């Protein structure tokens, strides 16, 4: 049962969202869209500034960044992140004005939100791997990085779901580095299925880039398992503690059975 402060906080955030979307972001994006490539960078910068402002000024929340100064956003890459809340996208889009996101079909078809993201080069997950590879490759040549949630959907209980292969296969095919971004706390502030925002702290943890895996099934699978091991360890879901993060290569990497998908709570 939400308390009064949570209800007022939710109302304040909803008003800020509506004012930002209808009063600024949507009109500016639609007005600039007819000018095509000439205003593409400006549209992305508008989204970046809006998300950066919103993430830093959410009522009742504290934002902490780790690894932001060391991040190399000028280098196109595949960002992979855990998915716990609708707030996750806000926390990722604030990182750089040169990000595009692989999003689900429901968001892509939304009359209002979809109108914005289609003009920001976001990609629908249903387009298929070959088309996705072609589009991501084109965007990478233009200096953009792509954000993918390898779980495919938000977790209902905060537990890390199984990682699907797509992000790692894309990185392998296009020879793009992988950047792990671990999100903490968004599930406690606005969990899946909730209609109210709670007080809390959000941590955005940006890790050094991993090299692209070799373009073969075994290497892609191994990178997927290693990446999930990193996220499990950083989220404190490492079970018996055999996986200890030390560097991008996960020294002391545990056997696959340790990071099996038995804790998965959601599937794409």
Which residues does each predicted region cover?
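Short acidic-hydrophobic, aromatic-tinged amphipathic segments that line or gate anion-handling sites
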Residues: 65, 123-127, 212
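Non-catalytic C-terminal accessory region of glycerolipid acyltransferases
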Residues: 4-8, 130-268
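Glycine-rich helix-loop-beta junction characteristic of Rossmann-like nucleotide cofactor-binding loops
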Residues: 67-72
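Structured helix-beta-strand junction loops
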Residues: 61, 98, 119-120, 142-143, ...
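Hydrophobic alpha-helical segments typical of transmembrane helices
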Residues: 50, 88-91, 112, 166-167, ...
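Catalytic core of membrane glycerolipid acyltransferases/transacylases, capturing the structured
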Residues: 28-45, 73-128
């Amino acid at each position: 049962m939400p308390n009064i402060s949570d209800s007022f906080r939710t109302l304040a955030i909803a008003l800020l969202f509506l004012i930002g979307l209808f009063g600024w972001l949507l009109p500016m994006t639609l007005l600039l869209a007819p000018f095509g490539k000439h205003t593409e960078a400006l549209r992305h910068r508008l989204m970046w500034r809006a998300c950066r402002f919103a993430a830093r000024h959410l009522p009742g929340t504290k934002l902490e960044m780790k690894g932001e100064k060391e991040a190399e956003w000028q280098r196109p890459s595949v960002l992979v992140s855990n998915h716990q809340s609708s707030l996750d996208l806000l926390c990722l889009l604030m990182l750089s004005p040169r990000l595009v996101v692989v999003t689900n079909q429901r968001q892509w078809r939304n009359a209002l939100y979809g109108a914005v993201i289609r003009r920001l080069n976001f990609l629908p997950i249903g387009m298929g791997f070959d088309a996705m590879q072609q589009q991501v490759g084109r965007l990478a040549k233009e200096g953009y990085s792509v954000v993918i949630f390898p779980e495919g959907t938000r977790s209902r209980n905060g537990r890390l779901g199984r990682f699907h292969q797509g992000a790692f296969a894309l990185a392998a095919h296009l020879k793009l580095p992988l950047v792990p971004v671990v999100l903490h706390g968004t599930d406690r502030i606005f969990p899946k299925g909730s209609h109210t925002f709670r007080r809390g702290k959000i941590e955005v943890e940006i890790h050094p880039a991993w090299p692209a895996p070799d373009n073969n099934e075994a290497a892609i699978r191994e990178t997927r398992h290693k990446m999930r091991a990193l996220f499990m360890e950083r989220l404190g879901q490492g079970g018996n503690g055999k996986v200890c993060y030390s560097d991008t290569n996960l020294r002391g990497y545990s056997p696959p059975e340790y990071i099996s998908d038995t804790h998965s709570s959601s599937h794409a």
